[in-house]
Amino acid sequence: MSYLLPHLHSGWAVDQSILAEEERLVVIRFGHDWDETCMQMDEVLASVAETIKNFAVIYLVDITEVPDFNTMYELYDPSTVMFFFRNKHIMIDLGTGNNNKINWALKDKQEFIDIIETVYRGARKGRGLVIAPKDYSTKYRY
């Protein structure tokens, strides 16, 4: 499904996509196109792209092809989704302790749309940290 979404092939392209967008949230999935977790996330991203196009834009970045941000954003997971608004990284508190990114595959489309809407509303108000609509601290039931 990753072929349905725009890929960024250089660090410069990533920077320009973040800088160029003034009114919409920039959602970037960093990862490997061949990874199973990425494929699951890409499927959700592709399915919501049309719904959220008025307030968010989605890009994909292969961290092997574009390693520029791996250290800066600690991109060690197979799939990582990050949010940017007006050239600023927007953090999201998901209850997991890591407020910088979503590093697992969300399987529910509406759940992801809710997260994007929440991040967008918070970013428009000038917030750098947004509280997620759902607590993911117990996403794994032990």
Curated annotation (Swiss-Prot):
What Gene Ontology terms describe where this protein resides (cellular component)? cytoplasm; nucleus; U4/U6 x U5 tri-snRNP complex
* InterPro entries in UniProt: Dim1 (IPR004123), Thioredoxin-like_sf (IPR036249)
- Name the Gene3D superfamilies for this protein: Glutaredoxin
**A single GO BP annotation from the record?**
mRNA splicing, via spliceosome
- Summarize tissue expression: Expressed in roots, leaves, stems, cauline leaves and flowers.
SMART domains this protein is in?
Answer: DIM1 (SM01410)
Annotated PANTHER family: THIOREDOXIN-LIKE PROTEIN YLS8 (PTHR12052:SF13), THIOREDOXIN-LIKE PROTEN 4A, 4B (PTHR12052)
Q: Which family does it belong to?
A: Belongs to the DIM1 family.
> What's the protein called, per UniProt?
Thioredoxin-like protein YLS8
* Lineage of source species: Eukaryota, Viridiplantae, Streptophyta, Embryophyta, Tracheophyta
Q: Which gene encodes it?
A: YLS8
